[in-house]
């Protein structure tokens, strides 16, 4: 049973899952909208919203924390300087998930995840 289980495994090892979320987060920050499976989008939503909340602080330590998660200078810079300031007055809810289609081949439900 999965009662009170805190996260989705996404059929991956912990290191693979961490790398997947990092790459999806970078793609979302750089493009501001990506298409992925619904399960990945839901997992990414909690990951990216925590990052944006950290980035909203705007100080040097927040910059270092965000970079530690993303390990990408351009994405960190864009998140800190462009994206996070847009959400200063918003308390959470920075992303939107829109279900789109089922993927041919494995019939996985797909969705767009975008920054609001």
From Swiss-Prot:
Under the subunit heading, UniProt states: Part of the 50S ribosomal subunit. Contacts protein L32.
The protein's matches in Pfam families, at most eight in alphabetical order, are given as:
Ribosomal_L17
* CC annotations in GO: cytosolic large ribosomal subunit
Question: What are the alphabetically sorted keywords of the record?
Answer: Ribonucleoprotein, Ribosomal protein
Show the GO MF annotations.
structural constituent of ribosome
Q: What is this protein called?
A: Large ribosomal subunit protein bL17
Matching InterPro entries, A to Z? Ribosomal_bL17 (IPR000456), Ribosomal_bL17_CS (IPR047859), Ribosomal_bL17_sf (IPR036373)
Family to which the UniProt record says this protein belongs: Belongs to the bacterial ribosomal protein bL17 family.
The lineage is:
Bacteria, Pseudomonadati, Campylobacterota, Epsilonproteobacteria, Nautiliales
Would the keyword rRNA-binding turn up in this protein's UniProt record?
Answer: no
In the UniProt record, the signal sequence range is: none
Gene Ontology biological process: translation
């Amino acid at each position: 049973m999965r009662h009170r289980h805190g996260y989705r495994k996404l059929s991956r090892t912990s290191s693979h899952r961490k790398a997947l979320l990092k790459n999806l987060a970078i793609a979302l920050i750089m493009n501001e909208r990506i298409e992925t499976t619904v399960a990945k989008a839901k997992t990414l939503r909690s990951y990216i919203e925590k990052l944006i909340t950290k980035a909203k602080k705007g100080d040097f330590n927040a910059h270092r924390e965000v970079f530690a998660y993303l390990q990408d200078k351009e994405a960190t810079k864009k998140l800190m300087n462009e994206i996070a300031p847009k959400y200063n007055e918003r308390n959470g809810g920075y992303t939107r998930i829109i279900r789109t289609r089922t993927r041919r081949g494995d019939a996985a439900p797909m969705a767009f995840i975008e920054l609001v």
